[in-house]
Amino acid sequence: MPVAIAAARYAALSAGASSSRSAIMLSSSHRALSTSSKVASSSSSSNRGTFSPTSPILFSASSSSSSSSSPSSSRELSHLSWDKYLQLRRSRRLAGMVTTIPTTLLAGAAAGSYFLTLELDPTNAIAGLDPVYINAGLTLACTGLGWLIGPTVGNSIWGLLHRSDAKQIAQKDHDFYEHIKRNRVDPTRQSVQNPVPDYYGEKIGSIKQYRQWLRDQAAFRRKAAHGLEQDA
């Protein structure tokens, strides 16, 4: 009988120990699962944290590139030198002078072929004048109109050939005319013996000619101030 009681106690103790061991194993497995889930969540949050700053960096890079493009455009506008600009200006003036010849001839020929070939009645006077003189005057007027529009046509053709430098030339035109207005003489002081030297600076085609233009303006001022004395 005592042996049976001892055996029962031993069996109960062994069963309790096994159940406690299984409980400990279950709790440890739960803790392992919770720690692994925490590690996974922390790693995902860290990945999100490292990815999120990339968009501001991209925007800042794009903004810096856009800001750097504006100084480059300003440098392109200021790339045209004064010597090159004055050469282009001289070629533009030459183009206007050259195209004046064909426009004048074409206008005169067209007007003459029309007005001078009309059948006229000499007895029908126009405003008291012979119709022949009226038609001749109209022919001359059309010829003069062709001479006037010649520079406009030449400048338009020249502008089409230099479209790539249009903005730079326009800026240089503005700066050049500001120089001319600031340094040219007062035209009210001119006389027959002392005319104004190139008031608009149209003949300036180089830096050397611009310096000569400045000397001519100074000579005009001296003559106007000292009674038309001969400039030494």
Swiss-Prot record:
Residues 1-40 form a transit peptide. Signal peptide: none annotated. InterPro entries: Pam17. It is found in: Mitochondrion inner membrane. The keyword Protein transport applies. Keywords: Membrane, Mitochondrion, Mitochondrion inner membrane, Protein transport, Transit peptide, Translocation, Transmembrane, Transmembrane helix, Transport. GO terms for biological process: protein import into mitochondrial matrix. Its main location: mitochondrion. Pfam families: Pam17 (PF08566). The chain crosses the membrane at residues 96-116, 140-160. GO terms for cellular component: PAM complex, Tim23 associated import motor. It is a multi-pass membrane protein. Component of the PAM complex, a complex required for the translocation of transit peptide-containing proteins from the inner membrane into the mitochondrial matrix in an ATP-dependent manner. Belongs to the PAM17 family. Component of the PAM complex, at least composed of mtHsp70 (SSC1), MGE1, TIM44, PAM16, PAM17 and PAM18. This is Presequence translocated-associated motor subunit PAM17, mitochondrial. It comes from Mycosarcoma maydis. The gene is PAM17.
